[in-house]
């Protein structure tokens, strides 16, 4: 029963052929030196592990337990299936001899590094390669390949490896080895002499005493688990970075890592010119241009170009959030989100703008911010040509064209394109005004409105027009003003064809056609089509005059009246008649004046049908009928 328990797991041991990867000569020619080096290291590691497991070497068609790996087979392992042609050889970079196989080259080059020749412990004969040494040793002891599971069990339970450095030393004869796989084979050669033990005895002692691995005290109940652990210990991280001290198991991994310090990015995309440190990163990037997304989610069918992205996405369906913040307990689906979140607690802002010194938590936030300095607006609306610095702003803008308003007020049914506007609107119904001006005590529903209002008292106008020098208290006023110079009126009324510079102005105008007056005064019940009109009207009840002239201290109920009044002191007359050149301080005065040239008389008397140029003239005339 114990013996069966031990041998069962071994049935799943793989051979070298199961894990080997082959290239055609055409594919092999496309690899750079670093990739060939990596392939070389990986194949040697795979060969070492399959040999330690007792699996067959390259090209072995027999079952793993029916034949051990001979030294000749190990030294003759091929790289690509198309590679072992006699015409295809590998030159030694030091002395120039041409060797037919990759592993022959490895053993040959070991002689250039001061390694010992392999010596037979019995007759002290020196041989250059371990393959020849093992062939020679068979002449002394008449060894044959072990075929019983008992022999394999004893081999696995008696091997002790030195993992502290190279070369590897056999404790039976004191012989040194350069290649790990040769060391494993030497150990197997010694254990074959002890094959008189039975499988049941091995099983009994193996169950009673768990397998222990050299200096590592970790214990295992099954051989295949122990051997896997041994493989991890064999993979010594012998390549260390001189910059940061980080170690790697292969020279290629170290080469890739060194590019972090040198900033070298040798792999460039032919489509967009973007460069990468590793060829695998370039291959993944190219899928953006080709549209290839080979990894599909079984739950929703969504496609991904990287397997890692698919694994992260699948956590949306499973609800898995394995990364937990130790500060607040919040969990995340991937580690990068946790790292970014932890910056909230530490206050770290690693991404700094080189222009203004402002720092950010996310690199994406820095990229977006830098567009303020460069003026880049990569996201353009296909309907009106307006461009935006962020994609989210373009998405919101598109709703204006399609009439989409995803945010609906439950009180009045009004739809809003932006969530912020929706929240602002809800305060109309609730009456919440939590932001108070310390100068005049006025309340505002938004802090931003309070900040803009305070500039009335301070006189601050930080936003100046580069065309005419006019300044404004908030940026939105400046943006609106710019359209005076550009003449842009992208918003057109479907009823009368009139166009407007702002969508909000169009909405207000459309109420002229619909007759809608949604804003009601709580004092007198009067309705208004615009909220600003209601606000101005309320001041007639309260007597509030928040806008004060700094010259004569006269106050006004609305800002536009103050602006008009200031022109009395400055003498400014910005509105000029194109017919006679006469200028006016108010646009309404210019409109009335232009009727003199056009002959327009829009005001009609309802009693006699007479027309007048000005409303004031009509009012005077109506007194005639009243008698």
Curated annotation (Swiss-Prot):
GO molecular function: DNA-binding transcription factor activity, RNA polymerase II-specific; RNA polymerase II cis-regulatory region sequence-specific DNA binding; zinc ion binding
KRAB domain boundaries: 14-96
Compartments, as annotated in UniProt: Nucleus
Pfam families assigned to the protein according to its UniProt record, in alphabetical order: KRAB, zf-C2H2, zf-C2H2_15
Superkingdom of this protein's organism: Eukaryota
Known partners and oligomeric status: Interacts with TRIM28.
Domain statement: The KRAB domain mediates interaction with TRIM28 and is required for transcriptional repressor activity.
Name of the protein this chain belongs to: Zinc finger protein 256
């Amino acid at each position: 029963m114990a013996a069966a328990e031990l041998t069962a797991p071994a049935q799943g041991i793989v051979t070298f052929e199961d894990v080997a990867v082959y290239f055609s000569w055409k594919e092999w020619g496309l690899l750079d030196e670093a990739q060939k080096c990596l392939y070389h290291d990986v194949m040697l590691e795979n060969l070492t592990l399959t040999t330690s497991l007792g699996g067959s070497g390259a090209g072995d068609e027999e079952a793993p337990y029916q034949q051990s790996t001979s030294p000749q087979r190990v030294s003759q392992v091929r790289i690509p299936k198309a590679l072992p042609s006699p015409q295809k050889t590998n030159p030694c970079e030091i002395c120039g001899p041409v060797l037919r196989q990759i592993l022959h080259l490895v053993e040959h080059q070991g002689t250039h590094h001061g390694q010992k020749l392999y010596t037979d412990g019995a007759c002290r004969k020196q041989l250059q390669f371990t393959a020849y040494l093992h062939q020679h040793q068979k002449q002394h002891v008449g060894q044959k390949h072990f075929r019983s599971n008992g022999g394999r069990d004893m081999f696995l339970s008696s091997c002790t490896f030195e993992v502290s450095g190279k070369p590897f030393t056999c404790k039976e004869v004191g012989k040194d080895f350069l290649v790990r796989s040769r060391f494993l084979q030497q150990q197997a050669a010694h254990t074959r002499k002890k094959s008189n033990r039975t499988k049941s005895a091995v099983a009994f002692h193996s169950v009673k005493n768990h397998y222990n691995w050299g200096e590592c005290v970790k214990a295992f109940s099954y051989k295949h688990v122990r051997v896997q652990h041994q493989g991890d210990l064999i993979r010594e991280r012998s390549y260390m970075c001189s910059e940061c001290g980080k170690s790697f198991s292969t020279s290629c991994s170290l080469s890739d890592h060194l590019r972090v310090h040198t900033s070298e990015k040798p792999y460039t995309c032919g489509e967009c010119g973007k460069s990468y440190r590793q060829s695998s990163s370039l291959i993944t990037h190219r899928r953006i241009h080709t549209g290839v997304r080979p990894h599909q989610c079984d739950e929703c069918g969504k496609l991904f170009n990287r397997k890692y992205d698919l694994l992260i996405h699948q956590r949306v369906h499973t609800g898995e959030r394995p990364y937990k913040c130790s500060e607040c307990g919040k969990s995340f689906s991937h580690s990068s989100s946790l790292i970014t979140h932890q910056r909230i607690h530490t206050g770290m802002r690693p991404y700094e703008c080189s222009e203004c010194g402002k720092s950010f938590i996310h690199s994406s936030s820095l990229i977006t911010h830098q567009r303020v300095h460069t003026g880049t607006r990569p996201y353009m609306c296909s309907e009106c040509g307006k461009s935006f610095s962020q994609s989210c702003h373009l998405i919101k803008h598109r709703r204006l064209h399609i009439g989409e308003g995803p945010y609906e007020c439950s009180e009045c049914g009004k739809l809003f394109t932006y969530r912020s506007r929706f929240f602002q609107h809800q305060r109309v119904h609730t009456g919440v005004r939590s932001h108070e001006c310390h100068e005049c005590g006025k309340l505002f529903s938004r802090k931003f409105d309070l900040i803009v209002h305070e500039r009335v008292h301070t006189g601050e106008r930080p936003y100046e027009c580069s065309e005419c020098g006019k300044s404004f208290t908030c940026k939105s006023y400046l943006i609106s003003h710019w359209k005076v110079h550009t003449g842009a009126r992208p918003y057109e009324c479907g009823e009368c064809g009139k166009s407007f510079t702002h969508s909000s102005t169009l909405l207000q105008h459309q109420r002229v056609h619909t007759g809608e007056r949604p804003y009601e005064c709580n004092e007198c019940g009067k309705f208004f089509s615009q909220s600003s009109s209601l606000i101005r009207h309320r001041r007639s009840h309260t007597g509030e005059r928040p806008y004060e002239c700094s010259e004569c201290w006269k106050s006004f109920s609305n800002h536009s009246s103050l602006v008009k009044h200031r022109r009395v002191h400055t003498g400014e007359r910005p509105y000029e008649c194109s017919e006679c050149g006469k200028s006016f301080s108010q646009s309404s005065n210019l409109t009335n004046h232009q009727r003199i040239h056009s002959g327009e008389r829009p005001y009609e008397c309802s009693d006699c049908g007479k027309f007048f140029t000005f409303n004031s003239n009509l009012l005077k005339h109506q007194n005639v009928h009243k008698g």
